[in-house]
């Protein structure tokens, strides 16, 4: 995805999210409205995405576009997550990274986050690793999750007892964080870790 402009990346992400939410692609006017540009400007972005192989379009038909088969296993890297104290989420599309299909759970959306910090080292999740997250809003005790509390995101092991949620680090030098269950939003479960050697 390094050949895309920042706006083209955002348009592509919007198309993917729109299709996931609605079951059909956005119209040129909906894209234009979302980015506060003219329909002609939106069309030029679609033409660029098509030329670069990210989407396929049928000229003259409304909503006749789809994500190219060649990028279906490319998962969005949408920023960083702290494996330490909870911090404000950094959510922007950085890139798409191809992931083998065997790592992906059928019927689920996935995204990648870059890990910052050392709170999960005893689970072999280190600073600089990429975690593959299966998007879901629930977790079982012991799952490693990306969780949001008061608008801030952290990577921790999840445990719930009654109406209390414990977000536990996998580092003996760090302490668990405890919250009322309604304050914790699960963004997804970690299902893979990738590291450059």
Swiss-Prot record:
Residues under site feature: Cleavage: 83-84
PANTHER family in alphabetical order: LEXA REPRESSOR, LEXA REPRESSOR-RELATED
First-level EC class: hydrolase
SUPFAM superfamilies xrefs: LexA/Signal peptidase, Winged helix' DNA-binding domain
UniProt entry tagged with the keyword Nuclease: no
Other observations noted: No consensus sequence similar to the SOS-box from E.coli or from B.subtilis was found upstream of the lexA gene, suggesting the presence of another target sequence specific for the Thermotogales.
DNA-binding region positions on the chain: 28-47
Function: Represses a number of genes involved in the response to DNA damage (SOS response), including recA and lexA. In the presence of single-stranded DNA, RecA interacts with LexA causing an autocatalytic cleavage which disrupts the DNA-binding part of LexA, leading to derepression of the SOS regulon and eventually DNA repair.
Keywords carried by this UniProt record: Autocatalytic cleavage, DNA damage, DNA repair, DNA replication, DNA-binding, Hydrolase, Repressor, SOS response, Transcription, Transcription regulation
Molecular function as annotated in GO: DNA-binding transcription repressor activity; sequence-specific DNA binding; serine-type endopeptidase activity
Gene3D superfamilies associated with the record: Umud Fragment, subunit A, Winged helix-like DNA-binding domain superfamily/Winged helix DNA-binding domain
EC number: 3.4.21.88
Any one GO biological process: DNA repair
Family to which this protein belongs: Belongs to the peptidase S24 family.
Protein name in UniProt: LexA repressor
Species assigned in the record: Thermotoga maritima (strain ATCC 43589 / DSM 3109 / JCM 10099 / NBRC 100826 / MSB8)
Active site: 119 (for autocatalytic cleavage activity), 156 (for autocatalytic cleavage activity)
Record bears the keyword DNA damage: yes
Taxonomic placement: Bacteria, Thermotogati, Thermotogota, Thermotogae, Thermotogales
Catalytic activity line of the entry: Hydrolysis of Ala-|-Gly bond in repressor LexA
Pfam families: LexA_DNA_bind, Peptidase_S24
GO cellular component: protein-DNA complex
Assembly and binders: Homodimer.
